[in-house]
Swiss-Prot record:
Residue ranges of the region described as Disordered: 116-140, 303-323
The species this protein was found in: Neosartorya fischeri (strain ATCC 1020 / DSM 3700 / CBS 544.65 / FGSC A1164 / JCM 1740 / NRRL 181 / WB 181) (Aspergillus fischerianus)
Pfam families in alphabetical order: WD40
UniProt entry keywords in alphabetical sequence: Repeat, WD repeat
Matches recorded under SUPFAM superfamilies: WD40 repeat-like
UniProt GO cellular component terms: cytosolic [4Fe-4S] assembly targeting complex
Highest taxon of source: Eukaryota
Coiled-coil intervals: none
Single Gene Ontology BP annotation: iron-sulfur cluster assembly
WD repeat feature ranges: 15-57, 61-103, 153-192, 200-239, 244-310, 344-383, 418-459
Xref: InterPro entries: CIAO1/Cia1 (IPR028608), G-protein_beta_WD-40_rep (IPR020472), WD40/YVTN_repeat-like_dom_sf (IPR015943), WD40_repeat_dom_sf (IPR036322), WD40_rpt (IPR001680)
Protein name in UniProt: Probable cytosolic iron-sulfur protein assembly protein 1
Organism classification: Eukaryota, Fungi, Dikarya, Ascomycota, Pezizomycotina
Function summary: Essential component of the cytosolic iron-sulfur (Fe/S) protein assembly machinery. Required for the maturation of extramitochondrial Fe/S proteins.
Length: 462
């Protein structure tokens, strides 16, 4: 499907210098204008999003490729990064934010690292090194990434790590088909406790992602399923198994809690339609998006509780297929496929990212294409396959919403061959921080990560 001509995705900058080996994933910091990238060269590189240059290189913690990383939220005074590697371990790294959590602070970090970044030197401490050849020694500890702890438990490659909204729980998943949940005891000694190991997946678990406000975990797997996990009576267990994809599910991501579809200027009573959509949407909560080897991007919506109770069957087994003696039927959730987004990829889709600021979606994959989608409210339009229905109540009628109120997803921008001939492994949204940004706005950039080692930053012009 052709993108609308009113939107354009343009290259803003490459992150320099790049890794000379495959890069897997880029994780923007939740508060600072920096991004961490994972590489096959066993390192994590931290770049500035203000000038797109390398700030530091984290080395020495892993023996094989670093596949994934995630920043811990709600940490004051320091940055905490979790990394997952093909060596089957998870590393926790810390760095004091002595420069402060402001853009001015990032400039301070630049001044502290005035060396030639391309030299990519480390301090040789055997754990973590920050590129720094100009320190006087007194502040050296403040400038280093500290290798805090190694979490060991998986039997094979770690594919994804994700912190819970509170930052107290860390979820990890692996090729060994398991999902582990670790609790950060926050005792000052970097101690973590294993609170759950889930092994219901029948294949390599590719991705884990936490609900934006609840302690609910979503996972995606080589077994073509998406599974939802919650804690019940001090035990973690599966509450839903979503089947719909016809191939490996590579990635899942959650909608932001405050997301609202855009209302076209020609939509009559746009404010009323938006209010009605929000009211109906609140019954189900944030939706889930997934992408797959089957070249589709799908959106899933949880049924409201009243509707779930109405549809529940008096069976000794819940919707997950687990006996009720282990997992009570009342804890099961029912998820519906809300829509399949417009077909826009020719090969496997590796990552889909849901912007928490704008509600737009971006997808990338083996075809080297970047696709950006936008959801729009429509009233009384002709039916299309990408249109979505509002949540329904137990009697099957639309909940507090006119029958004609719908949303539809449209492709608004595409870039072919974004990294030349190379596959794109990951895409993420980040708040724009360079000098070209528009002040007073929530302007965003897209960050794409590819097989050739490059990481590119893109702007979307509407």
């Amino acid at each position: 499907m052709a993108a609308e001509s009113s939107s354009q995705l343009s290259l803003l900058s490459d992150l320099t210098p790049p890794s000379l080996e495959r890069t897997w994933l880029s994780a923007p910091h939740p508060t600072l204008p920096i991004v961490a990238t994972c590489s096959s060269d066993k390192t994590v590189r931290v770049y500035s999003l203000t000038n797109f240059r390398l700030l530091s290189t984290i080395t020495g913690g892993h023996k094989r490729s670093v596949r994934t990383c995630a920043w811990k939220p709600h940490v004051k005074g320091e940055s905490v990064l979790a990394t997952g590697s093909f060596d089957a371990t998870v590393g926790i790294w810390r760095r004091w934010d002595s420069y402060g959590q402001t853009e001015r602070g990032i400039e301070d970090w630049h001044r502290a690292d005035t060396h030639d970044h391309a030299d990519d030197m480390t301090n040789g401490n055997g754990a973590a090194g920050i590129d720094n050849d100009g320190g006087d020694g007194a502040d050296e500890d403040d400038e280093e990434w500290r290798f805090a702890v190694l979490l060991d438990g998986h039997d094979s490659e770690v594919k994804s790590v994700s912190w819970s909204p509170s930052g107290m729980l860390l979820a990890t998943c692996s090729r060994d088909k398991s999902i582990w949940i670790w609790e950060d005891l926050d005792d000052g000694d970097n101690n973590f406790e294993t609170v759950a190991v889930m092994q219901e997946h029948q294949g390599d678990v590719k991705c884990v992602a936490w609900h934006p406000v609840e302690e609910c975990l979503a996972s995606a797997s080589y077994d073509d399923t998406i599974r939802l996990w919650r804690e019940d009576l001090d035990d973690w267990g599966q509450v839903a198994c979503i089947k719909g994809h016809q191939g490996t599910v590579w990635c899942v991501d959650w909608e932001g809690a405050e997301n609202v579809p855009s209302a076209p200027t020609d939509l009559a009573d746009g404010d009323l339609a938006t209010a009605q959509w929000k009211k109906a949407h609140a019954l189900s909560g944030p939706r889930l998006v997934s992408c797959s080897d089957d070249r589709t991007v799908r959106i899933w919506r949880r049924q409201p509780k009243e509707q779930q109770q109405h549809q529940a069957q008096p069976s000794p087994f819940g919707g997950s297929g687990i006996p009720s003696i282990i997992r009570p039927t009342g804890s099961d959730e029912f998820w519906d496929e809300e829509c399949v987004l417009p077909q826009a990829h020719d090969l496997s889709i590796y990552t889909v990212a849901w912007s928490k600021r704008t509600g737009r979606l971006a997808s990338v994959g083996a075809d080297g294409r970047i696709v950006v989608y936008e959801e729009r409210l429509v009233v009384g339009s002709t039916a299309e396959t990408m249109e979505t229905d509002p949540p329904t109540s137990a009697d099957g009628t639309a909940a507090d919403s006119p029958a004609a109120l719908r949303t539809e997803w449209r492709v608004i921008a595409t870039v072919d061959g974004a990294h030349g001939i190379y596959e794109i492994n990951h895409v993420s949204w980040a708040k724009r921080a360079d000098r070209g940004r528009t002040e007073g706005t929530d302007e965003e950039v897209l960050i794409t990560t590819a097989d050739d080692g490059t990481v590119k930053v893109w702007t979307l012009k509407m």
